[in-house]
Amino acid sequence: MVFEKIKALIATQLSLDASTITLDTRFKEDLGLDSLDALELVMEVEKTFQINISDATLQNFKTVQDIVFYITKNTP
């Protein structure tokens, strides 16, 4: 469920086909995510899942799996 929501957020944010996004999709290398895109995506994730993601934590997100794992661990 978390993955599906994240996938939809990424697809909407970057105007992509959601079916191309997998857990192994890399933000920078595969999606071409720049710092502005990353900031906007994190703001949407924080709003959707009602969590706060620090800048330091954000720097650790390399793949979709990374953010899904973080959300799963840090939400009730």
From Swiss-Prot:
Signal peptide: none annotated. GO terms for cellular component: cytosol; membrane. It comes from Onion yellows phytoplasma (strain OY-M). This is Acyl carrier protein. 4'-phosphopantetheine is transferred from CoA to a specific serine of apo-ACP by AcpS. This modification is essential for activity because fatty acids are bound in thioester linkage to the sulfhydryl of the prosthetic group. Residues 1-75 form the Carrier domain. Keywords: Cytoplasm, Fatty acid biosynthesis, Fatty acid metabolism, Lipid biosynthesis, Lipid metabolism, Phosphopantetheine, Phosphoprotein. GO terms for molecular function: acyl binding; acyl carrier activity. GO terms for biological process: lipid A biosynthetic process. Carrier of the growing fatty acid chain in fatty acid biosynthesis. Pathway: Lipid metabolism; fatty acid biosynthesis. It comes from the Bacteria. HAMAP family: Acyl_carrier. It is found in: Cytoplasm. Belongs to the acyl carrier protein (ACP) family. The modification O-(pantetheine 4'-phosphoryl)serine is found at residue 35.
